[in-house]
Structure formats: C-alpha cells, structure tokens
C-alpha cells in the first residue's frame, strides 16, 4: 500500500528486509533452544523485563497511526481514510498473529505465545 511507485518499492524492500531479519533470528533461536533447554525461560523473563522497563509506552503514537492510515488510504476521501484505518488495524492484528506464530515455532505454548505477544511494545520496536 503506497501513494506512489517509489514509496511502494521502498515499503516492499523494507518488508522483505524485516522478514529476513525475523527469519534469521527465529532460526538462530530455534537452533539455540535445541542445545539450551532453559533458553525459553530466559527469553520469557527478558520479554517481561523489557515490558516492565518500557511500560510507559502504551501504544503507537497518533502521528504514526495517522501516517500509516494516510499511506494505506491512498487518498483524502472519507471512504479512502476509512479503508486506510481498516488496513492499519489489520496490520496490527497481523503483526500480533505473526509474533504468536514465531513464538510457537520456538517452542512456547499457545498461552505463553499469546501472553508474550501481548507484552510486545506497541510501537513497532
């Protein structure tokens, strides 16, 4: 979703780059878990500590939401903005689902994956 070809290309390349980073990290952790059964516990504790340290960050700031909405809307009409808003909501849901799936692949239970995903800082970090 982009208002012009350059932004569309940049967005696609950034998404591909992020997917590679996540795939590498998950593959590395998955292999590490095989050799260190306590790693999942330490990762769990790390997520909780990070959440506690950053708990003042309660969500995406409005400027980020507005920018994402405008980029995905592709226009200024009420209909386009509504579509953009729906797409941003779907993006956030898809990111949660993706985090949960990656955590399941690492060996966390469904409940642990849901809890850890919920603790994720809601600012795309």
Describe the residue ranges of each PLM region.
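Aromatic-enriched hydrophobic runs in primary sequence
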Residues: 1, 15, 23-24, 35, ...
């Amino acid at each position: 979703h982009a208002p012009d070809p350059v932004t569309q290309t940049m967005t696609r390349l950034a998404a591909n780059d992020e997917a590679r980073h996540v795939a590498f990290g998950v593959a590395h952790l998955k292999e590490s878990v095989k050799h260190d059964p306590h790693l999942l516990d330490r990762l769990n504790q790390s997520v909780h500590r990070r959440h506690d340290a950053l708990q003042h960050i309660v969500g995406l700031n409005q400027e980020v939401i507005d920018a994402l909405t405008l980029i995905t809307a592709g226009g200024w009409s009420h209909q386009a903005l509504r579509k953009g808003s729906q797409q941003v909501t779907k993006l956030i849901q898809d990111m949660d689902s993706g985090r949960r799936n990656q955590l399941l692949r690492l060996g966390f239970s469904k409940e642990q994956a849901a809890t850890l995903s919920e603790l994720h800082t809601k600012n795309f970090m």
